Amino acid sequence: GETLPYRTRSSELCYAPEQLDAGAFRDAFALCFSSACLLDSPARLTHLKAIAAARDVGTFVCYAPRMTESAPFWPDAASLRETARAFFPQADVLLLKSSDLFPLFGSHELRTALFALFSGHVQLIFYSDSENIHLFTRSVLLSAAKNDLTEAELLYRLCRLNTWPDKLAGLRESTLRKLLF
């Protein structure tokens, strides 16, 4: 394929929106994606179509920016940051690591980022650092000592609690505790 200065063209970047079967989301619980394939390519447009299709059938849209992991695929940090931040409002759930903060906001302080993170559809933020796991809604903050809870386990627990995107805004602290423990 064509060699770009920052990435060799690969099949996932060439996946065009018209190739997406929107019906595949009917039985899905969540659509999860990262910044790695959001380059200026057909794949970015395919992600937008997938997000719309998932939203149409009530499927969770989960975005994990993964700035450190995605950086090698991007031509520069500024375009990665701009694109990653532009996709925040598309997600119902943001899955963040402490390593995402500085590349996104120029600070390691989560407090400086929270206001910007709760935009658009975002109703729940799962944030992990080396010591703790935090769950945020627009009205509740809950923290716990680091345990074995992974992002996949969080989504599984949301599913088991029969929690769908339209219910996220009303999550109470007691429900968040069930997700963490």
PLM region descriptions:
Residues 2-142, 148, 155-181:
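Ribokinase/PfkB-type carbohydrate-kinase core domain
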